[in-house]
Amino acid sequence: MKKSLFLLMLTASLGAYAANHEVKMLDNGKDGSMVFEPGYVNAKVSDTVTFKAANKGHWVQSKALPDGVADFLSEDGKDFTLKLDKEGVYVYTCPPHRMMNMSGVIQVGKPVNKAKAQAVVDELENRAMQSKGRLKKYMQQVK
């Protein structure tokens, strides 16, 4: 009984250290129009990121992920929470506003897939018609 209670308390306490990071999907923000705010998040394994649909017409889709992480795609205009189970760099975008460079970066622990993520960022930047350099700026924060 004591062992079971100890394990239950230990498991409950582990979740207490996980943080939730909120990223707003906005028509206008500090970094311009059609933007995720913040555009760069530094998180730990077991944290979550909640994408808040602050304005209609936005959703989030993965573009680069650490090995073993499943692709994700949220629904239009709905909040979406992503559990960060693996270290690495997560690059995501808003599909209808991809050409406006509405994309962002999450770093979880060590950037084990940085080269792969950088290649995706370079491709997204090359295709952007507006706000060029914004995603590159977020990626430069990955250390």
Report residues per predicted region.
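Sec-dependent N-terminal signal peptides
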Residues: L7-L8
